[in-house]
C-alpha cells in the first residue's frame, strides 16, 4: 500500500534524525517540529487541492527535477534531497554550494517573473545560483497534465522503492494527493520556452546587503527578456553542478 510505505518512510526518517541529536532537548524539539509539519502536510490532503498557481509551480519544479534525475549526477535519493521547494525553503533546489530557483509562468507577459524576498536571488553565500524559467501555455486536453508529469517520475523511480517513497512523501508535502487527481486531469501544459540564467553580481535583482535598514520581505519583478547575456545552456548548467 502506497500510503503505508510513505508513513513507514516518514517514521524511519524521524527515527534517523532523532538518533543524530546529541541532547534530549534537541530530540524533543525536533519531534514536536516534525509532528507539526506532518499535521500541516496531512491537512492539505483534506483541502480542496492545489490552486492553479500551486499546480503550475509544482509542474515547473517537477520539470527541473526530471532533468536533474536524467543527468545522473547524483543518486535518486540524493537528487530528491536537493528538491527542497516543498519544504518552503528559500529556493527550490539546494545543493552543497549551489542552488536553483524555478519560476513557471503561463500569463501573456511570460517574461515577467516575480521574486519573493531579497534573498531568493542573492548568491552571496553560494558558489553558483541559477534561475530556471519555464514559460507554458495552459489549456484543456492539449499537452501534459500535472498528473502526467507525476506519473512519469514515478515510473522513473519504480525500481527504487526508497526513492519512490521519498518522492511520494515530497508530493504530499507539496499538497499533491492522489485523491485530488481528478481536479488536475484537464489542465494541460505545453512548453513555450525554457531558459536557465546564471545569477552573478551584475544580474538585475535585489540583494539583502543593498537594502536600507528596516526594509525586508521585498517582492519585485524581473523582465528576463533583458537578461539574455546571463543565459546558459543546459549542458553548461548541469556540468557546473557535478
Question: Where on the chain are the PLM-derived regions?
Answer:
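Nucleic-acid endonuclease domains
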Residues: 1-88, 105-242
Amino acid at each position: 500500500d502506497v500510503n503505508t510505505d510513505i508513513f513507514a518512510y516518514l517514521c524511519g526518517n524521524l527515527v534517523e534524525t532523532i538518533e543524530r541529536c546529541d541532547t534530549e532537548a534537541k530530540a524533543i524539539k525536533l519531534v514536536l517540529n516534525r509532528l507539526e509539519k506532518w499535521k500541516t502536510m496531512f491537512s492539505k490532503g483534506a483541502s480542496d487541492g492545489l490552486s492553479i498557481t500551486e499546480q503550475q509551480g509544482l509542474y515547473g519544479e517537477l520539470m527541473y527535477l526530471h532533468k536533474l534525475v536524467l543527468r545522473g549526477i547524483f543518486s535518486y535519493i540524493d537528487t530528491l534531497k536537493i528538491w527542497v521547494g516543498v519544504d518552503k525553503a528559500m529556493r527550490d533546489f539546494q545543493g552543497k554550494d549551489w542552488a536553483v530557483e524555478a519560476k513557471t509562468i503561463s500569463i501573456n507577459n511570460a517574461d515577467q517573473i516575480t521574486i519573493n524576498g531579497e534573498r531568493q536571488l542573492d548568491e552571496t553565500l553560494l558558489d553558483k545560483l541559477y534561475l530556471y524559467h519555464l514559460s507554458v501555455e495552459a489549456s484543456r486536453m492539449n499537452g501534459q497534465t500535472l498528473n502526467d508529469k507525476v506519473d512519469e517520475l514515478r515510473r522513473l523511480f519504480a525500481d527504487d522503492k526508497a526513492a519512490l517513497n521519498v518522492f511520494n512523501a515530497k508530493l504530499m508535502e507539496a499538497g499533491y494527493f492522489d485523491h485530488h487527481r481528478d481536479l488536475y486531469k484537464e489542465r494541460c501544459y505545453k512548453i513555450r520556452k525554457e531558459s536557465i540564467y546564471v545569477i552573478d553580481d551584475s544580474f538585475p535583482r535585489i540583494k539583502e546587503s543593498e537594502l536600507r535598514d528596516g526594509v525586508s520581505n521585498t517582492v519585485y519583478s524581473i523582465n528576463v527578456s533583458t537578461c539574455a547575456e546571463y543565459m546558459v545552456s543546459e549542458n553548461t548548467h548541469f556540468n557546473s553542478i557535478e
